[in-house]
């Protein structure tokens, strides 16, 4: 379900929140569940959305801006003002498909690095919206991929941890000023 939070989809020269990048320990720490959905949290959601739009992203998890909360914002159509964003509070994966899809991913925390990642094609999640209402969502295609990518951030995992081709990954990271030593491969 789309969010009711209203944020102008525009790029700001100085977004409200600072991104953290691969190699920063903050990205490796698991996020904590959110106990209370209130106006302070809704302001954080607005700030995260504005930061995401300012950086040309389609998804952002709170740990990427140094906040250890289980909070994700997603907008697959950032250029479409009529399409509201998706806000996921304390998301949990209920089910994933057996069908695996390989597609290229990028990340605001690892600028200019794009690599193929295998993920389940369909994912079903439970979460709370920005008003604290429990919701479920079955997602496919790009939305399923984006949800899984952002949920990884909540667990201290970044997409490069899931890349199979370590040689190409090391070259891409080095070319963009990142160290392969910051990668923590997951099975």
From Swiss-Prot:
UniProt xrefs under Gene3D superfamilies: Peptide deformylase (3.90.45.10)
Q: Which domain of life is it from?
A: Bacteria
For this protein, the record's SUPFAM superfamilies field holds: Peptide deformylase
Keyword list (alphabetical) reads: Hydrolase, Iron, Metal-binding, Protein biosynthesis
Q: Where does Fe cation bind?
A: 107, 149, 153
- The EC number on file is 3.5.1.88
Per the Swiss-Prot or TrEMBL record, the active site comprises 150
Against Pfam families, the record matches this protein to:
Pep_deformylase
> Entry cofactor note text?
Binds 1 Fe(2+) ion.
Which reactions does this protein catalyse?
N-terminal N-formyl-L-methionyl-[peptide] + H2O = N-terminal L-methionyl-[peptide] + formate
The UniProt entry's GO biological process terms, in alphabetical order, are:
co-translational protein modification; translation
Which top EC class applies here?
Answer: hydrolase
Extract the GO molecular function terms from the UniProt entry: metal ion binding; peptide deformylase activity
Q: What cofactor does this chain's UniProt record say it requires?
A: Fe(2+)
Q: What does this protein do?
A: Removes the formyl group from the N-terminal Met of newly synthesized proteins. Requires at least a dipeptide for an efficient rate of reaction. N-terminal L-methionine is a prerequisite for activity but the enzyme has broad specificity at other positions.
Note the HAMAP family from the entry: Pep_deformylase
- Family classification: Belongs to the polypeptide deformylase family.
* Protein's UniProt name: Peptide deformylase
What organism is listed for this UniProt entry?
A: Microchaete diplosiphon
* Organism ancestry: Bacteria, Bacillati, Cyanobacteriota, Cyanophyceae, Nostocales
